[in-house]
Amino acid sequence: NEDKVQHILVQELPHSPESFIHLDMVFTFLDKDKCMVYEPLIMSPGNYQTVHIKIQHGKLISIRREKTLLHALKKLGMDLEPVYCGGEDETWNMEREQWHSGANFFCVAPGKVLGYARNNYTVEAMNNAGFEIIRANDVISNKVDLSKYEKYMITIEGSELPRGGGGARCMTMPINRDAVEW
């Protein structure tokens, strides 16, 4: 519908290191009301710009700077609670786990995500946010019935995948799934 206003949010990222190659390395949706964030970049206004662009009838309506990406999303009706990559306490843990794709989750459905087991502080933050932590090997061997859990994180073992330059979302081909109603 051409009458509908299109909203484009642009999040500036650092040019280096390569762990900031795209948005999924610092921000991913986990559920309808939760997202994984790399706090030093996503939650710190001023360091990197967030821009909100509005387009209608193929024409630019406005461009404005927003305080943060989460602030801009909230204005659009997506009030998201952040879960912090690397936990909330130590910047070193945040940096280390972001470098190891700790903010990069593959969301199969709202509240059902896959991510790396090696990011211990991130896994703990997910558990504290209400996600059941389930090992991928337990799913593969049918030791776990996923239908019994409302929210879960399936943890993927290994250190070789992050060396390939991405996380669970980066390394997943597109899938067909039902649209999420916000």
Cite the ranges covered by each PLM segment.
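The feature marks the mature, well-folded catalytic cores of soluble enzymes
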Residues: 1-182
